[in-house]
């Protein structure tokens, strides 16, 4: 009689939907019943009330927890897209796992099935395979443990140096900071490139687009900027340090390998994270890589530190997103891109920000790269990103092949907020340079048709040629801001107007060597003060005049 009552009590305690019961629940219930039978002799010797209490205690003490796992089955698979039936409660952008071990992300939530993009080779998945929810939105490891490492879009190490030891993880699709935590850009982000720091200055927390045709030096500007941060990161002042994240999207593996080698040779990898989703990787990984890199950069920003992230390039991310959207049968729009391609980039670039002191005072600066076709900046993706960012550096093929490198078009390049962050010393020497160069380009176009030019026009042309020569700079050779100030000072104050344009580069190299070796105190004063005082101006004038006399002799 007791056995029947025990069995009935156990059955009543179990959930009614047996299809959802795990083995753990059944096993633990049967163990409770077996334990009761084992102590049946003991129960017979006790009173009815005591026996009931022991029985109740045994049944209530049994582990009846139910581990529910929602699973579905693959209806169709192809082109990196899986249609899955049965995942009724899956979240948007939730990670799911296939029976082969491959991971995917749910993007399309439809009434009868879920569209899942696969992170890898879909040949490992077959129709009818079981798909399991993980309950986790896609996240990546973050933290200083990633510095010096090369990782994929999911944060897995691909540099052969072992797994990432970071214990902190962040979602890749976090919302951008609101209005209240932000503050206007006020600190300079030195690139070490004369043409950029003087004409299109960038501030910490800014979004500055680098745009141009292929093979015009877009990546070179980004890499030089990373290398230039070594002078700040070698110091102990955490406020001056700038941690760098380079996101390679759709590039060749050999290109990424060369880039990592270049950064290693320059001793810049120790403060850099490289996130790589190469051309051979699945489109979902190329789509995800910028968001993963941004989450890694936000870790530094939200901890009161400063970070720089380079997206090279967002054109390929847009192409990968277009591929995924068309395969998911989303309606195409202009140039076959989906309607939310603007939101694709705006929600990414809005995460770059300068935070106010109440929120740590950190910053995340973004340098997105966009590749144009035959200089067409009015195409869909370039115009979108231009409208989102705080300015652009426009690189021209024509200037590049003329030997003007970096091939920055001064007229089309602009920095909307960076001038507020430019150091006062650079403002003092470069204030009129952009106007002079713009006038020079305009006059140079008309000067081709006539030889009779007045003295003022000839002076403008002469100054423009020399300033253009002065702004040329070799690859992987960034300069300190005080060195740039000294060189540009000589050009804009007219000391080089009588020097042959072909000798400008030679003069610059010799002059820099002289100043660095003989007048380190003056450079230190400019660096510390952030401006050119009357004493510094007089000293600089004397140095340039004396050196030029010896150089021409």
UniProtKB/Swiss-Prot annotation:
Instruction: Extract the GO molecular function terms from the UniProt entry.
Output: ADP binding; angiostatin binding; ATP binding; MHC class I protein binding; proton-transporting ATP synthase activity, rotational mechanism
Query: InterPro entries, from UniProt?
Result: ATP_synth_asu-like_sf, ATP_synth_asu_C, ATP_synth_asu_C_sf, ATP_synth_F1_a_nt-bd_dom, ATP_synth_F1_asu, ATPase_a/bsu_AS, ATPase_F1/V1/A1_a/bsu_N, ATPase_F1/V1/A1_a/bsu_N_sf
**Is the DNA damage keyword given for this protein?**
no
Q: Which residues carry this modification: N6-acetyllysine?
A: 123, 126, 132, 161, 167, 230, 239-240, 261, 305, 427, 434, 498, 506, 531, 539, 541
Site description Required for activity, residues in chain: 413
Q: Provide one Gene Ontology cellular component.
A: plasma membrane
Location of the protein in the cell: Mitochondrion inner membrane; Cell membrane
Question: Which BP terms does GO give this entry?
Answer: lipid metabolic process; negative regulation of endothelial cell proliferation; positive regulation of blood vessel endothelial cell migration; proton motive force-driven ATP synthesis; proton motive force-driven mitochondrial ATP synthesis
Which residues does this entry mark as bearing Phosphothreonine? 134
In the record, which positions carry Omega-N-methylarginine? 204
Glycosylated where?
Answer: 76
Known PROSITE patterns for this protein? Answer: ATPASE_ALPHA_BETA
Function, as annotated, reads: Subunit alpha, of the mitochondrial membrane ATP synthase complex (F(1)F(0) ATP synthase or Complex V) that produces ATP from ADP in the presence of a proton gradient across the membrane which is generated by electron transport complexes of the respiratory chain. ATP synthase complex consist of a soluble F(1) head domain - the catalytic core - and a membrane F(1) domain - the membrane proton channel. These two domains are linked by a central stalk rotating inside the F(1) region and a stationary peripheral stalk.
Q: What else is known?
A: The siderophore enterobactin (Ent) produced by enteric bacteria binds Fe(3+) and helps bacteria scavenge iron ions from the environment. As a consequence, the mammalian siderocalin LCN2 plays an important role in defense against bacterial infections by sequestering iron bound to microbial siderophores. LCN2 can also bind iron bound to endogenous or nutrient-derived iron chelators and plays an important role in cellular iron homeostasis.
* Database matches in PANTHER family: ATP SYNTHASE SUBUNIT ALPHA, MITOCHONDRIAL
Q: How does the annotation summarize its subunit structure?
A: Homotrimer. Component of the ATP synthase complex composed at least of ATP5F1A/subunit alpha, ATP5F1B/subunit beta, ATP5MC1/subunit c (homooctomer), MT-ATP6/subunit a, MT-ATP8/subunit 8, ATP5ME/subunit e, ATP5MF/subunit f, ATP5MG/subunit g, ATP5MK/subunit k, ATP5MJ/subunit j, ATP5F1C/subunit gamma, ATP5F1D/subunit delta, ATP5F1E/subunit epsilon, ATP5PF/subunit F6, ATP5PB/subunit b, ATP5PD/subunit d, ATP5PO/subunit OSCP.
HAMAP family in alphabetical order: ATP_synth_alpha_bact
The text of the family note is: Belongs to the ATPase alpha/beta chains family.
Q: Per its record, how is this protein called by name?
A: ATP synthase F(1) complex subunit alpha, mitochondrial
Give the organism, scientific name.
Pongo abelii
Gene name in the database record: ATP5F1A
